[in-house]
């Protein structure tokens, strides 16, 4: 007999309904939680004979955000809307639970739903227009809101790093040699001519369109004042899994046309490496030391994909060719029978709500990932130990020593070690993608292919 998991009325949703009705009047007649890892809902409110469609954005949860105050994002969206940037209208902010109540912007992000290539290209250019408009906004309203204004070229370029680093340092529980290597390279190679700060989304390329029209930009959780080319770089990364609608190089040229800014492709490449690095730092502790309640499948997916982007972006910036190492694969490990039993037991669990089904799928994805680890993880560690011993010219008695020694080495090594260190990290991540890339969690990492800048 299948196991039935009963669900009850969610007290969080009751609080949100009560708040919305008190804020706007009327009656909430429909409320749907979105099937994603972050709490979010779409609502319909009946008021004065009309239907008002709303979206509620809840707290991310955990300690993975450089700007954890959700109210900050609500205030940013309000400022942007007041200055003509297409963003959702903000109706209010709920304190318990913390959540933004905003307009539900219609449309889709998936550009494959456009009617033609012509429409896709037009939509992509409308997004560039909106981003460029944002980059020209006066900064004083944002400064008055408490957003830091960087002034020197180094501060402007490294604004994202400075925002994310305290989060990384506070939560760091284990050595992170790749992140420390990337940080060292980025700090040594700051472009010194980027002296104009702008308001940036810092996780760009997120927009909704309908009938060939961009109706809104969304997700300003990480927005700050920094180098406008950081937005081009983060959108370039996003193009891997959420296509922008046209070739990135063409959109970058269009951005230059709209803004009058000269081409600076090396800086876009630099910011690609920087954004990938701070994004990896953001989730590194959540994967190294998992916390109860975290979306473990999502954070593991982010971790392996972002680490691969760090390596690819650094290789591009350094002019080093990518290499895929050879690896003898094994299909199953010593715990294969037990994992098969666990998968079967999981398949016998039935849940009622669609949301709980997503939770069950998350467990299934972790189990699939674990199966590949059971088959290959020890071999991966053996290879990593051999390579680290050669580079560091010492013998390790235990695999657990490697990351600590590598981190200490990258912090003291000079630029002459950049290439051998990058090649070591490249071999590590490429082998892991060979092992885990066929899983649902590893699929994103297997599709990493940064589009050309020019």
What residue spans do the PLM features occupy?
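Charged, amphipathic alpha-helical linkers/stalks
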Residues: 317-340
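C-terminal amphipathic alpha-helical interaction region
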Residues: 333-365, 370-454
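An alpha-helical support segment within catalytic cores of ATP-dependent transferases
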Residues: 12-26, 139-203, 211
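Active-site acidic catalytic loop and adjacent metal/ATP-binding pocket
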Residues: 38-45, 50-56, 90, 134, ...
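Active-site activation/catalytic loop segments of kinase-like enzymes and analogous catalytic loops
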Residues: 229-263, 274-295, 302-318
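ATP-binding pocket architecture of kinase catalytic cores
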Residues: 32-159, 166-178
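Short, solvent-exposed segments of well-ordered alpha helices
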Residues: 64, 223, 242, 267, ...
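Short, surface-exposed acidic
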Residues: 26-31, 261-269, 399
């Amino acid at each position: 007999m299948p196991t039935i998991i009963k669900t009850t009325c969610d007290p969080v949703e009751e609080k949100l309904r009560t708040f919305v009705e008190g804020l706007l009047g009327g009656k909430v007649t429909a409320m749907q939680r979105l099937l994603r890892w972050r709490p979010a809902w779409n609502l319909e409110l009946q008021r004065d004979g009309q239907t008002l469609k709303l979206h509620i954005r809840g707290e991310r949860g955990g300690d993975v955000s450089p700007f954890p105050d959700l109210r900050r994002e609500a205030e940013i969206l309000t400022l942007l809307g007041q200055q003509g940037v297409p963003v959702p209208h903000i109706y209010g902010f709920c304190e318990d639970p913390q959540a933004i109540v905003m307009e539900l912007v219609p449309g889709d992000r998936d550009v494959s739903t456009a009617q033609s290539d012509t429409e896709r290209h037009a939509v992509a250019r409308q997004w560039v227009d909106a981003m460029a408009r944002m980059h020209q906004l006066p900064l004083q309203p944002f400064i008055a809101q408490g957003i830091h204004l960087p002034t020197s070229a180094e501060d402007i370029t490294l604004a994202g790093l400075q925002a994310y680093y305290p989060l990384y340092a506070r939560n760091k529980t284990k050595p992170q040699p790749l992140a420390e290597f990337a940080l060292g390279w980025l700090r040594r190679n700051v472009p010194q001519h980027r002296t104009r700060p702008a308001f940036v989304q810092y996780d760009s390329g997120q927009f909704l369109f309908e009938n060939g029209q961009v109706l809104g930009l969304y997700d300003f959780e990480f927005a700050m004042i920094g180098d406008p080319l950081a937005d081009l770089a983060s959108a370039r990364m996003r193009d891997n899994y959420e296509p922008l609608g046209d070739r990135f190089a063409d959109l970058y040229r269009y951005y230059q046309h709209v803004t009058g800014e000269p081409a600076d492709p090396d800086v876009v490449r630099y910011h690609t490496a920087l954004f990938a690095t701070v994004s990896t730092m953001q989730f590194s502790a959540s994967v190294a030391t998992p916390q109860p309640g975290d979306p473990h499948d999502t954070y593991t997916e982010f971790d392996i994909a972002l680490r691969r982007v760090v390596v690819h972006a650094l290789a591009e910036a350094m002019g080093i060719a990518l290499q895929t190492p050879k690896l003898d694969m094994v299909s199953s490990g010593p715990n294969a029978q037990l994992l098969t039993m666990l998968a079967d037991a999981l398949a016998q669990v039935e849940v009622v709500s669609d949301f709980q089904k997503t939770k069950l799928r998350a467990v299934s994805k972790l189990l699939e990932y674990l199966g590949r680890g059971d088959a290959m993880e020890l071999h991966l560690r053996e290879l990593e130990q051999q390579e680290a011993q050669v580079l560091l010219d010492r013998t390790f008695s235990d695999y657990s020593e490697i990351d600590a020694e590598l981190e200490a080495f990258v912090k003291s090594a000079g630029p002459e070690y950049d290439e051998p260190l990058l090649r070591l990290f490249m071999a590590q991540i490429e082998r892991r993608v060979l092992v885990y890339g066929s899983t649902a969690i590893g699929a994103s990492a297997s599709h990493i292919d940064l589009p050309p800048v020019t």
